[in-house]
Swiss-Prot record:
Region feature Disordered, mapped onto this chain: 207-253, 283-307, 534-574
Organism: Schizosaccharomyces pombe (strain 972 / ATCC 24843) (Fission yeast)
Similarity comment: Belongs to the MUB1/samB family.
Gene3D superfamilies: 6.10.140.2220, Leucine-rich Repeat Variant
Zinc finger (MYND-type) residue numbers: 482-523
UniProt keyword annotations, A-Z: Cytoplasm, Cytoskeleton, Metal-binding, Nucleus, Zinc, Zinc-finger
Name this protein carries in UniProt: MYND-type zinc finger protein C31F10.10c
Main location: nucleus
Disulfide-linked positions: none
Skewed-composition ranges (Polar residues): 243-253, 283-301, 562-574
GO molecular-function terms, A-Z: zinc ion binding
Signal peptide: none
One of the GO BP terms on file: establishment or maintenance of cell polarity
Bias-annotated ranges (Low complexity): 542-556
Length: 574
């Protein structure tokens, strides 16, 4: 039995660690984070320089111990994240620099499910962030198309006021259909509700005579009326000159506890039909916006709070904030929101040149998957805890490198790559984990897009080229390059090659047409002139080699010796 590697201070016993000249298997079983971090940092150096250490790790159980560290997850502390990162680098060094037998052991130990989880989480996070970034850019760009009106105005509004209100509502109508199926809590936390972080957004309309109130009555102008359902019924009271909800004042508990309250300021002077209208949107706190109407001496303050989609990037004029369900049961009208989101998608076409569009990401996704709208909405729930589980760029690069080396010529290991599971403990969101079978080549093909770094594109293309290699153990046959087709050649040169790269083969025109959107990103063009020049250079080299073998002494003689010998012979004859 191996002795447990623990540090006992009162017995003057130190834990066993690994250094640059000594490897001890017990150091990987240490429960101290600091000593384990120190041992793994030295093990990274040993696995990159010593072939003997790489072989020993696959025999004494050290490789399985590293895999268990990777499956356990990163954790939330700096020490656990560093230990996870060092363990991944050790496994990558063993798989890249090891022999064929060592690479097979690494694949059998379970490195492919870990890489599958990293790649899919990275793509999922990138799609979510890009979709929110595109909405944020759209909210900053001026829009000329007015939002769809769901109900007619109860009184004539001047064009200046209507344009100003439309500009405010357009900033708030950029909600996509990804968020209409549920409430999204705020990712900024409850600390933003303090008094020091209060923001005030106001829109003042000071033209006299712009608003006319018929019959000396006021009305309740709800913000973004098309998002309110039929449950918010209102009633007119001409004697008091106010409009309010029926169920807001009947139950005192609703008025005291519900965040949706109406405060009425009475005045003895009546309101005039033509007066100065000041519309102020005051956001006192991030969770309690207020809408204030002041008509002459009489004023009425209405605090409205309705459900709205919460963005990861806050818009400058966001007067709609998220709230919890109150006793009023304010419900969203799904049809209006979907039609409004459809119009917003049509207007959200101008993005920054350096940011990839959402359509480009969705085109690169695997064919059989549909974008999970609920998953994208849940990605920003508790984002501060998920940021530690977000795959880094070096993690993606390490994963692609080890896949490129382990999928090279090992065709008997293809089932590990084409039918792999994920690791639920490594997932950022529990909604992404499941019993689905993943094809690693379908995930890797998405990293051949142009906006990825050149190193990521290089290794992704190398993996896709390995997928199209010929199987020399079965007579040099190739597989159809369509990722959804599993046909192999019955004999060599049965399938037709791609005309551009002359590497991939397809069993039919349908497979080539179906696989071309993905294959076009990693298809390298081979020019005929280049191939002819290579052939000519090979012929010239073969001719020179034959001449050198025929007369080896002639190549040793300098260039000017023939003229010298001929001149001496002529002198002797004279």
């Amino acid at each position: 039995m191996r002795e447990s590697n623990v540090s006992i201070v009162w017995n003057n016993k130190a834990s066993v660690t690994i250094n640059t000249v000594l490897y001890d298997r017990r150091a990987l079983d240490c429960d101290s984070e600091m000593s384990l971090m120190n041992s793994l940092s030295h093990l990274v150096y040993l696995t990159s320089t010593s072939p003997k250490i790489r072989e020993i790790l696959t025999m004494d159980g050290g490789l399985m111990r590293l895999m268990n560290i990777l499956r356990a997850g990163r954790g939330q502390t700096f020490a656990r994240m560093t230990i996870w990162q060092l363990a991944l680098q050790c496994v990558v060094n063993v798989g890249i620099r090891g022999s064929e037998a060592i690479r097979i052991r690494v694949v059998e130990a379970g490195i492919v499910p870990i890489v599958v989880t990293l790649l899919d989480d990275f793509l999922f996070a990138l799609e979510s962030v890009v979709s929110h970034h595109s909405r944020f850019q759209f909210s900053l760009t001026p829009s000329t198309t007015p939002p769809p009106s769901s109900a007619s105005a109860p009184f004539p509004i001047n064009s200046n006021i209507s344009n100003s209100l439309d500009s405010v509502s357009q900033h708030n109508s950029s909600a996509d259909s990804l968020f209409v199926n549920g409430d999204v809590p705020s990712p900024f936390g409850a600390s933003t509700a303090s008094s020091s972080s209060r923001r005030v957004y106001s829109v003042d309309l000071r033209d006299s005579g712009d608003v006319q109130l018929p019959n000396q009555s006021t009305f309740r102008h709800s913000v973004n009326r098309d998002l309110l359902g039929s449950s918010s019924t209102t009633s007119h009271d001409r004697s008091s000159g106010s409009i309010y909800s029926n169920d807001s004042f009947q139950d005192p508990r609703v008025q005291a506890n519900s965040p949706l309250t109406i405060q009425r300021i009475s005045s003895a002077a009546p309101s005039t039909p033509t007066s100065t209208e000041n519309v102020n949107y005051n956001m006192t706190t991030p969770s309690s916006p207020s809408y204030s109407r002041q008509t002459g001496p009489a004023s009425e303050t209405i605090n409205d709070e309705i459900d709205s989609p919460n963005f990861f990037f806050p818009t400058p004029l966001n007067i709609m904030t998220t709230t919890q369900d109150s006793s009023r049961d304010v419900q969203l009208s799904l049809n209006n929101v979907q039609s409004q989101a459809l119009n917003n998608r049509q207007r959200r076409n101008q993005l920054l040149p350096g940011v990839p569009s959402t359509s480009a990401l969705l085109d690169g996704r695997r064919p059989e998957n549909v974008v999970d709208y609920h998953g994208i909405a849940s990605f920003f729930d508790n984002f501060d805890k998920k940021i530690n589980k977000l795959p880094r760029e070096e993690d993606i690069l390490f994963g692609l490198q080890i896949l490129a080396y382990t999928s090279k010529n090992y065709f008997h290991m293809r089932p590990y790559f084409e039918s792999s599971k994920d690791v639920p403990s490594l997932r950022m969101s529990p909604l992404r984990s499941g019993s689905k079978t993943w094809n690693i080549f379908q995930l890797v093909e998405q990293f051949t897009l142009k906006f990825y770094p050149p190193q990521v594109q290089y290794w992704a293309r190398a993996i896709m080229n390995n997928y199209c290699r010929k199987d020399e153990s079965h007579g040099g046959i190739r597989r159809c390059a369509n990722l959804l087709c599993n046909k192999w050649e019955e004999h060599s040169r049965q399938f037709a090659k791609c005309r551009r790269c002359r590497r991939t083969k397809y069993c039919s025109k349908e497979c080539q047409h179906q696989a071309w959107p993905g294959h076009s990103r990693w298809c390298r063009v081979i020019h005929k002139d280049g191939r002819n020049s290579k052939r000519e250079s090979s012929k010239i080299n073969s001719v020179t080699e034959s001449e050198s073998t025929a007369s080896p002494a002639a190549s040793v003689i300098p260039v000017g010796t023939e003229s010298v010998t001929s001149s001496t012979q002529s002198d002797s004859r004279l």
